[in-house]
């Protein structure tokens, strides 16, 4: 793809974007009018650590990040932070969280289903669906639009502290089912 043509080569009307003509034009016009510095800022998704307006404005107006990830806090605080972030940003942000065990990955009040391995131990894939559905509904209610879940890693090395109980197990079929 020639330099400068990458945005026109992407099918924004198809999967995963499904934009109408107005949405596609907004993306193309926005991209065309962004400086190189602004485009670089869009690739960053730092960890948010507080809701102070000065910090939120720094992320959205100075750095012009593409997204932010927050750890669990009260639902009221998360919703307030997400609303401010979107209001301060010229481009809609990706707002991320680890909701791998349920909505409590974003808000203390969220539903906890336990770690994925515990859910898989029920041998009922419907529980995996319930966990994901609930996490998505609860996250979306607060403004979340990017969930780092479900975990589809396979636990081939039970000594690995990164995957371990955060997976649905060591059987690829079971992981797929859940």
Identify the meaning behind each predicted range.
Residues 1-62:
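Preference for extracellular/luminal or secreted protein segments
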Residues 49-52, 56-178:
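Enzymes and membrane/adaptor proteins characterized by extended Gly/Ser/Thr/Asp/Glu-rich
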């Amino acid at each position: 793809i020639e330099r400068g043509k990458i945005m026109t080569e992407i099918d924004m009307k198809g999967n995963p974007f499904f934009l109408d003509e107005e949405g596609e034009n907004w993306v193309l016009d926005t991209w065309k009018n962004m400086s190189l510095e602004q485009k670089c800022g869009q690739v960053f998704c730092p960890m948010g650590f507080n809701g102070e307006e000065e910090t939120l404005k720094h992320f959205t107006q100075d750095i012009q990040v593409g997204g932010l990830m927050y750890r669990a806090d009260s639902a009221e605080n998360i919703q307030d932070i997400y609303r401010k972030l979107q209001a301060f940003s010229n481009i809609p942000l990706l707002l991320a969280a680890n909701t791998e065990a349920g909505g409590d990955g974003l808000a203390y009040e969220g539903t906890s289903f336990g770690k994925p391995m515990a859910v898989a131990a029920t041998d009922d894939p419907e529980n995996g669906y319930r966990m994901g559905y609930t996490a998505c509904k609860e996250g979306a209610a607060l403004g979340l639009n990017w969930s780092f879940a479900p975990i589809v890693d396979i636990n081939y090395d039970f000594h690995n502290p990164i995957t371990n109980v955060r997976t649905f197990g060591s059987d690829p079929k079971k992981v797929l089912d859940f």
